UniProtKB/Swiss-Prot annotation:
Keyword Transferase: yes
Protein name: Uridylate kinase
Lineage: Bacteria, Thermotogati, Deinococcota, Deinococci, Thermales
Annotated ATP binding sites: 9-12, 51, 55, 158, 164, 167
Quaternary state and interactors: Homohexamer.
Amino acid sequence: MKYKRVLLKLSGEFLTRNGFGIEPEATQALAREIKAAYDTGVQLAIVIGAGNLWRGARQGVGMDRATADYIGMLATIMNALALQDALESLGVPTRVQTALTITQVAEPYIRRRALRHLEKERIVIFGGGTGNPFFSTDTAAALRALEVGAEVVLMAKNKVDGVYSDDPRKNPEAVRFDELTYLEVLNRGLQVMDTTAITLCMEAGLPIVVFDIFKPGALVGIIQGEKVGTLIH
């Protein structure tokens, strides 16, 4: 096994098949992929977005940016609870920790407690982003990965198996990269994660792997050291 502890960044859109809401079938399908990775023995932390419930850039037009971001943070907590439920239905012990304190439904984010959960072979899902407006869930993923000592950030995609020179769904000439440096991603303006998140990973030397989570065996393959997707380092 190549990695002992990883952070998996998920899009909220993985929890639905029609673009909006939380669908049990889609959530269960995602949970099964995660369980297969968990069964390898890897310590697994997760950060999930909220694109299935709230798009601040679109729905928050005319709204104060901080307010729109807080709504997005609450939506990530809803997604975290749905994913926790799906994982526990498969027998995977899972804890949700949130950057915004909602003690009735989840633990507050406490780094040492998160580390303890990982050591006890529990999956930890971090909800609420960083807890601050103006920061994306990509940045939350980079931040939490560094805090818990993850060896890599796994950026899950759907139907895109890595980083391409252009959108492969629109441009059949687009070329997939096997490896990129952080600076290449920034200088080319490649849509991997936002600039703040990439810079955080670059300064810490934290590698990123971009891959298709619904490609059978992809997530397990990365953990076991196979060359899957695009490595950014």
